Design a protein with these regions (language model features):
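Alpha-helical transmembrane segments and their immediate juxtamembrane cytosolic regions
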Residues: 1-325
Length: 325
């Protein structure tokens, strides 16, 4: 499921004009639901910080440093270096107009949500309060008109997805597992049709909620529609991932490699995509042609990361959130 999600992240960052609203309705929410599903409280806050340091923060800081190194070296004298570094340390997409964590905002946002969950996600009551406070803060920010691109406001927007994922793994696990087994043994054609119909519905409904920008904490014109489409789109991807399990066979090891390397793909996919995308921009100038062209470019980018992630895992596992040895 993470592989499907990262594909839509890659494709979405090509900004296909006909598919943009459709993709942005669910391509980021699905990752927060998955993250919530996989989360659990550590025995202590110290243990949480230690785990987060290796699995999230070290890859985050290294990738941000690699991406911003040219800016940091060339702008020491005019102060932009320090503004960018401060933005990276505090989770700003940009800080005072200077590039900071940019596409790595998701990782810092995830760290903040995990920390909030570790501190206040102990029981149903605290989870409800955490979710309600996040929603209130999110609505207040959207109504304020501020435009900051900060991981804290992004975390407020994403927290309901994260909590929903956690509940699927815990309190809702029994019906969730039953549905999983039911889909696995049911007709592939039936559930393919269900996923397709849901995607078609999202495609036509998503434009009714313009302005969705999760990296800016923006839910668009209608918050209820934002959360509804995020859940429905994630459910559709989940169906497709279950069906894919039945036909993947020996290719599953490559999917596992891609799934384990989402941090690296998130950080560097545009560096791989840009040179491949140039012919598409040059020759396919129409909207339909550009959408189709970038769809296949996104597949090529994903495939290119299979050997790249093998090299990273072998020689620089810290980028994958792993310790050596």
């Amino acid at each position: 499921m993470k592989v499907l999600g990262i594909f839509f992240i890659i494709w979405g960052h090509s900004f296909p004009p006909l598919m943009r609203d459709f993709i942005y309705a669910f391509n980021v929410p699905v990752f927060f639901i998955i993250s919530g599903y996989l989360t659990h409280s550590e025995p202590s806050f110290k243990a949480f910080l230690k785990k987060s340091w290796f699995t999230l923060l070290i890859p985050y800081f290294i990738i941000c440093a690699i991406k911003r190194m040219d800016l940091w070296i060339s702008h020491v004298g005019d102060g932009k270096t320090w503004l960018s570094m401060f933005g990276v340390l505090t989770g700003f997409h940009k800080f005072q107009g200077i590039h900071a964590c940019t596409m790595m905002w998701f990782i810092f946002t995830l760290f903040l949500m995990k920390m909030a969950f570790q501190l206040w996600g102990k029981n149903n009551r605290s989870l409800l309060i955490l979710t309600l406070c996040s929603l209130i803060g999110c609505v207040a920010f959207n109504q304020s008109g501020y435009d900051v691109g900060w991981s804290l406001t992004d975390a407020l927007l994403a927290m309901p997805f994260y909590v929903a994922g956690y509940l699927l793994a815990t309190q809702w696990s029994e019906p969730f597992d039953w549905l999983y087994q039911y889909i696995k043994r049911s007709s592939v054609w039936l559930w393919s049709g269900v996923a397709l119909l849901l995607f078609i519905a999202i495609y036509f409904v998503a434009p009714l909620n313009p302005g969705v920008e999760m990296f800016k904490g923006r839910y668009g014109a209608h918050p209820w529609l934002f959360y509804l489409l995020g859940v429905v789109g994630s459910f559709s991807l989940w169906i497709i991932s279950i069906l894919a399990e039945r036909v993947s066979g020996t290719h599953v090891k490559y999917l596992t490699r891609l799934s384990a390397g989402t941090i690296v793909i998130l950080g560097f996919h545009r560096d791989v995509a840009n040179p491949i995308e140039q012919p598409v921009k040059h020759y396919l100038t129409g909207t339909v042609g550009y959408d189709i062209g970038t769809f296949f470019v996104s597949i090529l980018v994903l495939l290119a990361f299979i050997p790249l992630l093998w090299l990273v895992k072998r020689y620089f596992p810290l980028l994958l959130g792993r310790r050596r040895g």
